[in-house]
UniProtKB/Swiss-Prot annotation:
Protein name in the entry: Small ribosomal subunit protein bS6
GO molecular function: rRNA binding; structural constituent of ribosome
Record Gene3D superfamilies: 3.30.70.60
Keyword presence, Ribosomal protein: yes
Keyword RNA-binding: yes
Gene: rpsF
Disulfide bonds: none
Family label: Belongs to the bacterial ribosomal protein bS6 family.
Length: 94
């Protein structure tokens, strides 16, 4: 198992869903694909440097987790289907 960090940017435009609910939904989806989440950090709402897909801001959340390298692709694909996720980046931690 390797340690990873995932930065997820949520699209909060036009949604009534609380941020905490979105955070737990994504965590549950990651766990179903074999990730063991060790930490979650809500960095808050931040403005983008430029507009992206008609959005000027997003809710930034960082997940620290451990998983097998083969689990990253299914996690990424599953979260890609969620319309409330604007961007997602993954980094391998040392």
């Amino acid at each position: 198992m390797r340690n990873y960090e995932a930065l997820i940017v949520f699209n909060m435009k036009g949604t009534e869903t609380p941020v905490e609910e979105l955070i737990s939904t994504v965590a549950a989806a990651m766990k179903e694909e074999g990730a063991d989440i060790t930490a979650t950090e809500n960095a808050g709402r931040r403005e983008f440097a430029y507009e992206s897909n008609h959005l000027s801001a997003g809710q930034y959340v960082t997940y620290t987790f451990s998983a097998e390298p083969s689990a990253i692709r299914p996690i990424r694909e599953r979260l890609r289907l969620n319309p409330q996720i604007h961007l997602q980046y993954y980094k391998v931690l040392g």
